C-alpha cells in the first residue's frame, strides 16, 4: 500500500539534525510555542516531511510580513489628536518612525521568554502575556484571546527599569516599571522622535505559575524560585545599557514599617502631587513617583536642587527643581503632606547625593556622561555642605526653639491668644492646643496656605 510505502521510507535527517532549531520554523512560529512544539514533534516522528514544514513556515512568515507592511500607511495618516494617536499606535509613537516600529513590534519573532496571565497596569489595565523577543529584542504584551500584540517597546530604548514593592497590600507584590527614553516626565523628545509609553505590570511573590523559555519549557516554578527574581534576571540579561533597580536600605528606608505586612521594611513615602496621591521611592539612580499616570522619574543628572517648604509638626513638602537634558529651563515639582517621621532619612539621602545644592548639578550631569572635569572647588563645596546643618534640620530646630519659648511664657488664662509673633504664631498655638485635634489638623495639613487663613476660621 502507498501508506506502508511512505512509512517504510528511510529517514533523510538524523536525530541530531532534528533536535536542533530550524530557523524558518523559529521565525514563523516563535510566538506560538505550543504550535512550534507540535511541529517539532511531528518532524521527529516523520523527519521526511521537514522540507514541507519549512515551506509552510516560509509562507506563514511572508503572509505576516505582508500584513505588517500593509498597515503602515494607516498608522501615519491618522488625523486624531496626538494623545489618541499614541494610544491607537499601541504606545509606539507617531510619524513614519512610529509606524515602522509598530510593524517591527508586531512582526512575529522567535521568543526568548514569555509569561502568561500577567496583570498590566500601564499603558493598559488588563491581563496579557509578557514577551521578550530574541535577536532584535522587544518587550511586548500580547492579547491572550486574539493573539495580537497590544503594545511594547524596543529594549535598546529603555532608560530605566525599576522593580518596586507594592505598598499597602496584604499579599507581597512587585511592580515592574519600564521607563523608555523621553517617558520620564522630565525630558521631552526631539521633534519627530516617537515616544513609547511607560509600561508597568505587577508580579506576585512566590514561584512563577506560567513562565516559559522560548522553547516552551516551563521555568521559575521550583522551590526557592520566585517570579520576581526570574523576571529581573531575564530583563538584566537583555538590557544593554542599564539594569533593573530595586530599593535598598543603604539608600533609603522609611522610618515606618510596612503597615499591611508586619515586620517588613517599607521603602516608600506617601506624598501628594496636587490632589494626586502616590508614593516616592528614593533609589540609587534617582527619585521615582508613582503609581498613577504620569509616572515621574528624576534621574540625578536632571535634578538641579531639592528644598523643603511648609515644614510643620507632622508634615512637610518636598520641592524638586528639575532640568531636562540639554535644556536651560527648569521645572519645579512639589510633593506635599510627607510625614515628618521620614524627614531624617530623606535629608540624609539628599545630602549623600549632593542634591540640595544647585551648584553641584553640573557635576552630576558630568558624572552621568563620565566627564572628568576639575573637581576641587565642587568637592570642597560638597564637603562644606555635608558639615553644615541641612535646611530641614534648621527649620525643625527653629520650630522646636519657638515651642520651648512658648511653653515658658504660657499663660493658662490667655487661651492661646497671640503670644508669638510673625508667621510662627499658628505653629506655636498648634503646640499649646494639642488637645484640640480637629483644629490642629486643619492648620497643620494646610501647610503654607494656612498662613493666609484667619485663626478663628480654622
Curated annotation (Swiss-Prot):
Q: What is the protein's major site of localization?
A: nucleus
Task: Specify residue ranges for compositional bias: Acidic residues.
Answer: 400-418, 427-438, 446-458
Region feature Disordered, mapped onto this chain:
371-458
Keywords recorded for this protein, A-Z: Chaperone, Chromosome, DNA-binding, Nucleus, Transcription, Transcription regulation
Localization per record? Nucleus; Chromosome
Task: Indicate yes or no for the key word Chaperone.
Answer: yes
Query: Which Gene3D superfamilies has this protein been placed in?
Result: 2.30.29.120, Pleckstrin-homology domain (PH domain)/Phosphotyrosine-binding domain (PTB) (2.30.29.30)
Please tell me one Gene Ontology term that the record gives under cellular component.
nucleus
- GO molecular function terms listed in the Swiss-Prot or TrEMBL record: DNA binding; histone binding; nucleosome binding
Give the function comment from the record.
Histones H3 and H4 chaperone involved in the nucleosome formation and heterochromatin silencing. Required for the deposition of H3K56ac-carrying H3-H4 complex onto newly-replicated DNA. Plays a role in the transcriptional regulation of the cell-cycle dependent histone genes by creating a repressive structure at the core histone gene promoter.
Q: Which PANTHER family match?
A: FACT COMPLEX SUBUNIT SSRP1 (PTHR45849), HISTONE CHAPERONE RTT106 (PTHR45849:SF3)
The family annotation for this protein states: Belongs to the RTT106 family.
**Subunit record text:** Interacts with histones H3 and H4.
Name the UniProt record assigns to this protein: Histone chaperone rtt106
**Origin organism of this chain?**
Emericella nidulans (strain FGSC A4 / ATCC 38163 / CBS 112.46 / NRRL 194 / M139)
